[in-house]
Amino acid sequence: MPLNPRPISTALYMDAGLMNGRTYTYDVRRVVPGPLPLEGEGLKGTATPRDRTPPGAPMGVKSERKGKAIAVTWQANMEKDLGGYNVYRIMGSQAVKLNSTPLKETAFLDAAAPDFRFIAYHVTAVDAEGNESEPSQESIIQKE
């Protein structure tokens, strides 16, 4: 059953409404126009769409001192395919990820925070496919 009602004249066809992770098989055929259109033998191909859309950046990132550690908190993202969060400590122009796997909770305690005058943090969201969001706004904490 053809996806397009009439032959197309370009070498591009967009099939919309597909499900990520499901494999689709296509049979592309050349059609010679005429009173009785002739179809050539088809070329088969498969495609499996993937989610490449990252979640939104986390909002409301805050940091506060808790003794020698720094607590970083943020608001939960609402995406249905959210996999977790990454927390980064920013020192100079270098951002270092502090967690090895995405965090499920919306809080992180940086127990190894260096004793600097200023430290900044940002948080990213990661979806189930591993797409990572843009960084949140930085939260900067100043040593008292």
Model-derived segments and their meaning:
Residues L3-S9, L98-K104:
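Short beta-strand segments within Ig-like beta-sandwich modules, predominantly Fibronectin type-III
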Residues M59-R65:
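Short beta-strand segments of immunoglobulin-like
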